[in-house]
C-alpha cells in the first residue's frame, strides 16, 4: 500500500527547456556548455554545483572563465534560469489534494540558484512535507545514497513509496532499493496518479 509519494522537480513538476539554456549560455561565450549540462544529472563543475560543493559565486566565476568574457552574475543566472519553464497549476492542485492522504516529498538534483527562486515563486513548502535537495545533502540521483538519506531522514519504507522521475537511471536505482516507480514522460499530466493510487 502506498503511503508516500516522492516527486522529482525538473521534468516532472517543472517543464524544462535545455536548448534555451544552452543557447543562452552560448550567447555569453560558453561554447562547450553541452559537455556539462543534461536534463538529468550535470557533469564537471555543474555537477559539483548541484552537489552543493560549489558556491553560487564560484559557479558564476567558472562560467566566466569558460566563456572568456566579462559577463555579470545576473547574466549567468538568467541564462541558467532558461532551463526552467513553469509548474502547471493543475500539477500543484493535484499535489495539494494528494497531501490530504499521503506524505509528499520532493527529491531533486538542484542548486542554490534555481531552488530558492522556485520555492518562493510557487510557495512549494505548502505542497510538500519535506524537500531532499542534492545541493543540501551532497549526493545526486542516481546515487543510491541520496535515496537512502531520504528513507532514513523521513522514516519511510521504500516499498510503501511511489517515486516519480523522468530519468531512467534514477528510476532504476529507486527500483533496486524497493520503491514503486513511475517514469514520467515529457509534458505528461499527472492524471496517471488517479490510476496508480
Task: Describe these PLM feature segments.
Residues 1-3, 111-112, 116-197:
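Asp-based, Mg2+/Mn2+-dependent phosphohydrolase catalytic module
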Residues 92-96, 171:
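Short amphipathic alpha-helical segments and helix-helix/interface helices
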Amino acid at each position: 500500500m502506498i503511503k508516500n509519494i516522492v516527486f522529482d522537480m525538473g521534468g516532472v513538476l517543472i517543464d524544462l527547456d535545455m536548448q534555451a539554456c544552452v543557447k543562452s549560455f552560448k550567447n555569453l561565450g560558453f561554447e562547450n556548455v553541452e559537455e556539462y549540462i543534461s536534463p538529468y544529472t550535470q557533469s564537471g563543475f555543474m555537477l559539483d554545483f548541484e552537489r552543493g560543493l560549489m558556491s553560487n559565486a564560484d559557479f558564476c566565476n567558472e562560467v566566466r572563465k569558460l566563456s572568456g568574457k566579462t559577463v555579470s552574475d545576473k547574466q549567468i543566472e538568467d541564462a541558467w534560469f532558461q532551463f526552467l519553464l513553469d509548474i502547471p497549476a493543475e500539477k500543484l492542485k493535484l499535489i495539494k489534494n494528494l497531501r490530504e492522504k499521503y506524505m509528499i516529498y520532493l527529491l531533486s538534483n538542484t542548486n542554490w540558484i534555481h531552488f530558492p527562486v522556485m520555492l518562493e515563486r510557487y510557495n512549494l513548502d505548502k505542497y510538500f512535507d519535506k524537500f531532499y535537495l542534492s545541493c543540501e545533502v551532497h549526493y545526486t540521483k542516481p546515487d543510491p545514497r541520496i535515496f537512502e538519506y531520504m528513507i532514513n531522514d523521513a522514516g519511510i519504507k521504500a516499498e510503501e513509496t511511489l517515486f516519480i522521475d523522468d530519468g531512467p537511471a534514477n528510476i532504476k536505482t529507486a527500483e533496486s532499493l524497493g520503491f514503486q516507480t513511475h517514469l514520467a514522460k515529457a509534458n505528461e499530466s499527472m492524471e496517471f496518479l488517479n490510476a496508480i493510487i
